[in-house]
Amino acid sequence: MGTGNSKENWRQSSFRSTSASSASPSSSSWASQQSYPQYGAESYNYPPPPSYAQPPEYTQPPPPLYSTQPYSAPSYSAPPSQSYGSDNKKRLERKYSKISDDYSSLEQVTEALARAGLESSNLIVGIDFTKSNEWTGARSFNRKSLHFIGSSPNPYEQAITIIGRTLAAFDEDNLIPCYGFGDASTHDQDVFSFNSEDRFCNGFEEVLSRYKEIVPQLKLAGPTSFAPIIDMAMTIVEQSGGQYHVLVIIADGQVTRSVDTENGQLSPQEQKTVDAIVQASKLPLSIVLVGVGDGPWDMMREFDDNIPARAFDNFQFVNFTEIMAKNKAQSLKETEFALSALMEIPQQYKATIELNLLGRRNGYIPERFPLPPPMRGGSSSYNSPKPSRLPSFKPSVPPHPTEGYHVRSSPVPPPTSSASDNQLCPICLSNPKDMAFGCGHQTCCECGPDLQMCPICRAPIQTRIKLY
């Protein structure tokens, strides 16, 4: 974006001496050196990264500041609303409530971004470490865990690399906040940073290397909720003074839905995720969900199309597995992925301008602190000092007056004792076993309904019995 200097000053000051003493190559040059195994119908022999033309400089002044009426949800503390022209705001919200996919090539998207004034953005990455990753690669990854680290890259490694190749060109300083969620230390309540003291990754090469180091240290768990990672992204945007960001979530499945959830109703995890997406639409933040593994993805497509009451359509779902399994050249598949991920960004960025969301703080966004990286044994370093706050941003325009942050604390779940492991659901590792399958194995009623095969013996599930 046009506020690169202040953003760069902040990010460089936040980046520790480690990165200052060892500059890393760009993500594009790094990714171009990677080689990949067979995935679907094509082999992963990457061509040189695509060349992005430098877009014209955006010369328009930043939009004027005015107050917005905050989204009112039980978990958020909002300041009093102010009158600022509600009719015009409602008109703009109707205009951007559903953004269509209007482009057929990556060049068209790049040109549209330039016309909208978006020379660059800031990427945030979130990665799903829930238990379902152990069986959602049954068809697409030869029945192995999607997080299996071996001689050939797993789907998460492939997605990280291709995102680094195709989307990193739109990140202005190559410093990427990266977080994990859904493991035994975070469940559906928190996120952990890929680096200690919440240091950002220096390009996607460090994202990939830290991913490989972290996976053996953690314990997959659940349930699945995207609310914590979206909350973390909102904290970053708020502390940047309202700079435009794109949150890329790489996940293997949709949000946990309990068997007790009635048709037309949302589970607690679904409701919190919807609330977070709606709240994020009050900020200059776009959300791209990249789906890896077998799915299912019907609820994510529903999130993409039909979440109500948003200031603008800020959510895009991309089925990575489906695109990468197509019988076409690898370069064409990469272009299709980048196009799918960026398709709505030009209109979303334009919406943040017209809704006057850029360049100011809201003052009512909950401040979230990430946990430190997990240690061997499946838990974060609980006895380590409290992680430091995110580094201070230097906004390019005076921040919106605030009344102080409402800090929402998330309790750290205690490590599960080995004596009680047998009584807990083997998927989420938090709920008691209260559903049995025909094979005799058991899970909880939240995890069981979404399974097609038993996670223990892999037998097809034909009978589900709720235990009382």
Curated annotation (Swiss-Prot):
Location in the cell: Cell membrane; Nucleus
The protein, known as: E3 ubiquitin-protein ligase RGLG2
SMART domains in alphabetical order: VWA
Functional summary from the UniProt entry: E3 ubiquitin-protein ligase that mediates the formation of 'Lys-63'-linked ubiquitin chains. Regulates apical dominance by acting on the auxin transport proteins abundance. Mediates ubiquitination and subsequent proteasomal degradation of ERF053 in response to drought stress. Acts as a negative regulator of drought stress response.
Catalytic reactions of this protein: S-ubiquitinyl-[E2 ubiquitin-conjugating enzyme]-L-cysteine + [acceptor protein]-L-lysine = [E2 ubiquitin-conjugating enzyme]-L-cysteine + N(6)-ubiquitinyl-[acceptor protein]-L-lysine
Domain of life of the native organism: Eukaryota
UniProt domain VWFA: residue ranges: 122-342
Assembly description: Interacts with the heterodimer UBC35/UEV1B, UBC35 alone, PIN1, but not with UCB2, UCB9, UEV1B or UEV1C alone. Interacts with ERF053.
GO CC aspect terms: nucleus; plasma membrane
Expression sites by tissue: Ubiquitously expressed.
RING-type zinc-finger residues: 425-458
E.C. number(s) listed in UniProt: 2.3.2.27
Biased composition (Pro residues): 46-65
Organism, scientific name: Arabidopsis thaliana (Mouse-ear cress)
Annotated spans, Disordered: 1-89, 369-416
Bias type Low complexity, positions: 12-45, 66-84
Membrane-topology annotation of the record: Lipid-anchor
Taxon lineage: Eukaryota, Viridiplantae, Streptophyta, Embryophyta, Tracheophyta
Leading EC class: transferase
Description of the deletion phenotype: No visible phenotype; due to the redundancy with RGLG1. Rglg1 and rglg2 double mutants show a complete loss of apical dominance. The double mutant seedlings rglg1 and rglg2 exhibit a dehydration-tolerant phenotype.
